[in-house]
Amino acid sequence: MKFSSSLPGSSHGSSAWLKPLLFVLVAAIGLYYVKWSPYYLKSFVAADKHSIGGSILANAPTAPWSAALEYATVYFLAIWKAAVLGVLLGSLVQVLVPRDWLLRVFGRAGLGSTLRGGLFALPGMMCSCCAAPVVAGMRRQQVSVGAALAFWIANPVLNPATLVFMGFVLGWHFAALRLVAGVLLVVGVSLIAQRVAQTETLPQAALDAVAAAEYEPMDDGRHFLVRWGSKLWQLFWTTMPVYIVVVLALGAARVWLFPQVDASMGNSLLWIVALAVVGTLFVIPTAAEIPIVQSMLSLGMGVGPAAALLMTLPSISLPSLLMLRKSFTPKVLMTVALLTMLIGAVSGLVAVVLL
C-alpha cells in the first residue's frame, strides 16, 4: 500500500500544537546555545585570522593507548554539549511530535521527502554522531529511510557555518566544491539507499500507527515523564556506549590511519582513494576537517587527497554507523558507507582537474 495524502490528520485544537511547540522551543534554545551563537562568533575569527584552530590530529602520541585517551579527551570535550542535545532531541521527537505529522512530512519514500529531510537538517549543524540519536528517534517513528538518511548526512555535510569557515580558511573554491558534491551526496546516497532498503511503500505498521493516532491519545495512558524517561534511556543505551568505545578505538588507530604528510603525498589516485576510505570511517567534531586539511596542505598534501578528506571526514563515521545499527539494515549502512567513499574519491579527482 502506497503512502498517500489520504492519511488521517492529527487532532484539531490548540492543545494539539502545545507539545510540538515545546519541541521546537527546546531545539531552538539548545541549538542557539550549542551551535548558533558559538559559530556566529567563530565566523569572525575565521574571516580575520583565516584559521579556526589547530588540527585535532596533530602531535599524536605514538603509543596506541595514549593516542586513544588523548584523542577521546579532546574529541568529547569538543562535542559533549551537542551529544547531550542530540540524545535529548532524539527522545523528545518520539513523545512531543505526533507520529502522523512526521509521516506526512517525512514518511514517503521519494525525492520530496528526502529533500525535506535534508532541508530540516540545515539549522542543526551537528556532526554525524550527534545527529545520529535524532535520526534514531525519527526512525522509531517510522520516518522513511531516505528522509532520515538525508537529515543525518546533511547535518555535517551541508552545515552552513562550516561552509563559511571553509571559504575564509581554505578558499571559496573548496567551499563551492563541498557544496555541490555535498548536495549530490545527501540526495543521491539517500535515494539509492532508499531503493536498497526496498521501502517505496510505507510499512503497514506505520499506516496502522497513523490511523491509531487519530483516535488514541499521544500519551498512551502513561505520564509524560515516564514515557520520555523510557525513550531517553532506550536511545542512550543503544547509541552512547558503542559510540564511546569506537571513538577510543579510532583514537588509537589514528597512529596508523594518518601517515606522515609530506610533498610525496601528491594527487595520485592511490592516496585519493585511501584517504576517502579513511575519512569515511574516522570520527571528528564539527568543522574539524578544516584545520586538518589546512595543516596537511601546508605540509605538501595535494588538493586531490585534501578534497577527498573534506568530503568524507564530516559525512559519516564508523561510530555513527554503529550508533544507527538498529535504525537501518546492514545493507543500507554498507551502501551509505561505500557511496560516501566513492563520492569522496570522485571529489578528489575533480579537485585535481579544477582546483
Question: Where do the model's predicted regions map?
Answer:
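Juxtamembrane and boundary regions of transmembrane helices in multi-pass small-molecule transporters
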Residues: 18-23, 27-41, 108, 113, ...
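Alpha-helical transmembrane segments of multipass membrane proteins
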Residues: 90, 94, 185-193, 246, ...
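Helix-boundary and loop/linker segments of multi-pass membrane transporters
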Residues: 59-61, 76, 103-109, 140-141, ...
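Transmembrane helical segments that form the transport core of multi-pass membrane transport proteins
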Residues: 69, 86, 96-106, 225-303
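Alpha-helical transmembrane segments in multi-pass membrane proteins
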Residues: 78, 82, 86, 90, ...
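Intrinsically disordered, low-complexity non-transmembrane regions of multi-pass membrane transporters
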Residues: 1-25, 41-63, 198-231
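Membrane-interfacial helix-loop connectors
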Residues: 121-179, 257-332
